[in-house]
Every structure is written in C-alpha cells, then in structure tokens.
Amino acid sequence: MLTTIVGRACRCDRSTLPAVLFQASSSTAGAISCSSGVASGSTSGGAVTVATGAAWAALGWDTGGSIRIPAALQGLVGFKNTQRLTPLQGAIPLSTTLDTACAITRSVRDAVLLHGVLAARTPQPLARPLRGLRLAVPQTVMVDGLDADVSRAFEHTLAVLRAGGAQIDDIALAPLAELSGLQAQGGFTAAESWSWHRARLLQREADYDPRVAQRIRRGEAMSAADYIDLVHARAHWIARVQAEMAGYDALLSPTVPMVAPPLAPLVDNDKRFFAINTLMLRNASPVNMLDGCALSLPCHAPGQMPVGLMVWGPAMADDAVLGVSLEIEAALAAGLAPATGR
C-alpha cells in the first residue's frame, strides 16, 4: 500500500489530556457539522482534514479516546486497536500503559486497510451476518445521561440491528462504576506523563497549555506504591470485566454521551471545561484501561448532528470488532426497517 503524508494538523499538546480542544497557542477548528461546536481534542485537527476530504485518513494517538472521540463528533470512523498490535517507537508518550497508535478514516473498510499497514499484519475481520450475532449493551455508566440526539441515534441503531436478526442483551458490567475510584489520583496518565514531562514542565511551564499542565501535575503527588497498587488493581479489574463480556461477539455503547458542545462557553470557564472534558472521555476511556479494542462509527440520521456508535471488545478481539463493525455499517447504510421498541 503506497502512503502519502500530506501534512500535520493541529492537535492537543499532549495527546488525550483534553478531550475538548481549545488552545490559546493555536487556532481551533470547529466541528465540520457545526462550526461553533468543538471538534474534540488531540486528533481533532486530523479528524477535520478527513471530514473535509483533505486527507484519506489521519494518524493519531488514543490514550483515552483521542481517536474515537473526534471521529464520533465529526461523523467518521475511529479504530483503537489492541495496544500491543501497533508500534509506539518514535513518539512522545503520554501514558506508556495506555497509548495506542491508530487512525481515523471515513469507513470501516478503510479502517481495516490502514490497521493492516500500521500493525504490519493482514486483518481477518470475522464475516458473520447480523442474524446470529450476540451483542451486549452495558448499562453501568455507558448509557447514563445521554443527550437527546445521542439517545435517539443509539436506540434507532439497536432497533435496526434487532430487525436484522442480531441478539442484543442488556448487561450490568458493574466494574465500570469503579474506574473513577481507581483513577482518583490521576491514574496511569498522570503518573506516566509526569515522569516524562517533569523536567521540561519545571523548566518551561510557559510553553505548556495551562490546562494540560494542570493535569500532568496530578502525577507529582503519586508515590511508587500508589502506582504499583494501580497496576495490580487494573489487572484485577480487567479479569472481572472480561468474565462478564464472555460469550458476546462485541459490546455496543455510545462513543460520546453528547453531540459536539459549543466551544465559546468553554474558553474562559475552567470548571465547565473540565466537566465537559470528563463527560466526553467517560465512555471511551474504559477500553484503554481494559487493554481492549474499539471502533467508533457514525450512527446518526442524515442531516443530524454526528453521533458515534462504539463497538468494543477485550484485548486481541480486533478482528471480531472489525467484522461486527462492517456488518453494522452495512445494516445502517441499507436502512433496515427498525423493530418497534427496544
């Protein structure tokens, strides 16, 4: 596959630290669907280049959703593969535990092709028709407080898939509620970004976006014992989540619980900024803690604000997630008549 690099787009200073991008040091593009709305953070500039047709795909870093969230807000496809499948050499780390090199594309097929290039492997998406697929919708955290646009698009998508013969179960997946407690001190991102940036931050803090610097500094208070406790807690958490996921071909969730919010109210309001930032990361970041894989694809109706559907699974379930995503994309494109009710 011949690849041409056409340029670099604006991105957040340090990967996923803001899921909502606003930087005084650079111009900020709005969402392509709504110029006054945020384009998201990190790989938001790359998402805009793909959405406008300036590039076929955009490469980026997904540490807590920085590929999937911009894709969702721009009506694109973002695939976060299992971390170990793509090399991380040569890039500045945010979190060596969570960072994943991956990409934004316009279709699931393109995501499959580009993943093959990045991972130097031949993906084998499991080709299975909707009828017979066993899918699950986690009820803990993932569907809380959805805005009207996201709720409408998500429920319609589930109805379309059921009409196509997919079995969709609601499951609790209760361990999702524990993540905020596990990461109360800042988690892997704070500890590992502080480790890498501390000398530079102490010497050249003026070069950092103030909101980014604030989040990196959370790692300053974490001890070695805190970090080791987090490593063990994560391993235990992963085992419990995987046990509840067993038996399903993939899980389904909204990628982001809201459509692109307006940018203006966030520029000078730190409290509002961090509240929206946390909300936008909420559904995507658990996949990174799981060491899992996930693909966001558009599921909104034509003419509506973009909404992303996240198809996700455990580590090394990449081909299954890609295969299910291909089927869902085709079903939505075909406009299968939705079933009545959920």
Please annotate each region the language model reported.
Residues T52-D144, E155-G164, M222, I228, ...:
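Structural helix-boundary/capping segments
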Residues M1, G7, D13-F22, S27-A101, ...:
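Short glycine/serine-rich loop/turn segments
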Residues D149-A172, R198-Q203, Y227-Y248, N277:
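Acyltransferase
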Residues P129-R134, G187-I238, S296-P306:
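Short helix-loop capping/hinge segments that flank enzyme active sites or metal/cofactor-binding pockets
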Residues Q167-Q185, I216-R217:
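Short connector loops at secondary-structure junctions
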Residues Q183, I228-D229, A260-L281:
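Short, surface-exposed loop/helix-turn segments at secondary-structure junctions
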Residues F273-L297:
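Small-aliphatic-rich amphipathic alpha-helix that forms the alpha element of a beta-alpha
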